[in-house]
């Protein structure tokens, strides 16, 4: 049997939910749109999995964090899709795609055809087994991407109360999971190869604050080395992590967060690629007519910096999906929409900490404020200056208005005459823009 739709979204993550909402706003008719997802649940806000989902008390659970609550919008329950005439194909994995013929095939043999396709397949976690790490297939080595992953991890946390946890990776997932494990009053060690945490974004000064804060919370941090092997007990459960520097760590549970890869293998050789993703224009149109790509998989023009980027973050997943849906409907009636003009935005929350970053982290940096990890209420930030202009801004502990101010600075790119004066002014500089 062939299922025919005017529009199909392949992928059921954050982008799918926000695209569906925008399709409805634009006037999609019942029966025109389908979402095909290999997950068993309707689109949800993925960031919850490394935060509130694992809280020791009152943990978040579906349906509480279906899209689009993450941006303050309506929660789109499965019934919402039914009411709007949107077909959800859950637990359905697409195994082949013919973009020229506009044809998809699922693992269970279902066939789909479409007029317009939105690729929203997101990223897959990088696994240590991909690199042939010895023992990396032992039980109780976890990765976190989907609700099923979080459920398995949560069960292990509750089952092994006095276990030793090792978190491999010093990025978003590593930092957020280490914090939530500590909130569960667990023994936690972080291991990562870089000289400091979050090296793609943080300066050494910013990282020093978070590493100090985590250490004060009792988290052991081991930097500059990697896991090269694991040993298991007679039940096949992990018991040790072997590090490249020769150290061996006891571990009953290991959580790996070493990044992701965009899931574009279905479309290899059919679409133009760039920077590891699918090349798109400012409307997320690909090189193939009537095919769009959004979220993690899209490499798009970053107008603000006259550059081309691929961005793995929930904010872009939401906004790119909305842009594509608007562009699709505009094209259907011979109209156009404004080009995507994205301001890069990243954020994280852990313990009592909350930071936001806007813009580009290139050039000279200026640190301001109180970045002492022992402070009762730390509040500090950093500006990035390139060619005499502020191009990026970071703030820990900001109020909503202060966070809006640093976003405004990053967008406006004001000139800086004296970096020492900028350091003295700190947040007040942003408030004046």
Curated annotation (Swiss-Prot):
Belongs to the FAD-dependent oxidoreductase family. FAD binds at residues 12-15, 39, 46, 51, 94, 145-146, 296, 314, 347. It comes from Pisum sativum (Garden pea). NAD(+) binds at residues 170-176, 194, 200, 259, 312-313, 347. It is found in: Cytoplasm. This is Monodehydroascorbate reductase. Disulfide bonds: none annotated. GO terms for cellular component: cytoplasm.
